[in-house]
Regions:
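N-terminal non-catalytic cap/leader segment that marks the start of a structured domain
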Residues: 1-82, 104
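Active-site glycine-rich loop that binds ribose-phosphate moieties when present
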Residues: 91-103, 117-123
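Residues embedded in well-ordered beta-strands
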Residues: 112-116, 137
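Ligand-binding beta-strand-loop-alpha-helix segment within the catalytic cores
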Residues: 86, 96, 111-113
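Functionally critical, mid-to-C-terminal surface segments that flank or help form catalytic/ligand
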Residues: 160-173
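Flexible glycine-rich active-site/ligand-binding loops centered on an Asp-His dyad
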Residues: 66, 79, 85-86, 128-154
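Solvent-exposed alpha-helices and their adjacent loops that cap or buttress functional pockets
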Residues: 34-38, 73-77, 83, 90-92, ...
Length: 173
């Protein structure tokens, strides 16, 4: 779509010599917006970093070290990632304030690598995946961890949307 066209236009602009060798911009008087202000959807992959999984299990999911190690071993055999979405209102700029919910005492964050998909695609073969990648950004996955676990819903237990989709909980740069 438009992303591919814009990248081509920027490359042509640069190739034509229209950009001086060094360009500087004073950003102190402005606000850095997210590089993509209205993404179609943002899919996050949870539990993709071993040390963080271990940290979270030690923080309360596992009752002891043996149970934690058993959970980690079981997770290694999974093929499909545990995915979740964030609300559009969670998107914010890299230097915007993160608004903390007044009734949460366990706000936490993780730095993540965000991949920008350049066009609509479904079930693409792994060997063709990079053909659909426009680039990469950094983001923070901010969570109200005390909202993620739902003791009032014993059968479901988790509400990741409620814990991770507060306004400003997805700053991007």
């Amino acid at each position: 779509g438009r992303w591919v066209e814009a990248v081509s236009e920027m490359a042509a602009f640069a190739d034509a010599g229209a950009v001086p060798g060094e360009v500087t911009v004073d950003i102190s008087a402005g606000r850095l917006l997210p590089p993509i202000t209205a993404p179609g959807k943002r899919i996050y992959a949870a539990a993709n970093y071993g040390d963080h999984i271990r940290e979270m299990l030690n923080a309360g999911t596992a009752r002891n070290d043996a149970e934690r190690d058993d959970m980690l071993d079981r997770d290694k055999t999974r093929v499909r990632p545990y995915s979740f979405l964030k609300a559009p209102s969670a998107l914010s700029g890299a230097h915007d304030d993160i608004i903390l919910p007044s009734d949460s005492t366990k706000v936490d964050w993780e730095v993540e690598l965000a991949m920008v998909v350049s066009r609509r695609t479904k079930r693409i073969a792994a060997e063709n995946a990079m053909d659909c990648i426009a680039g990469f950004m950094t983001t923070n996955d901010v969570s109200a961890r005390d909202w993620n676990m739902r003791e009032d819903w014993v059968t479901l237990r988790t509400d990741w949307f409620g814990g991770k989709s507060h306004d400003t909980f997805a700053p991007v740069s």
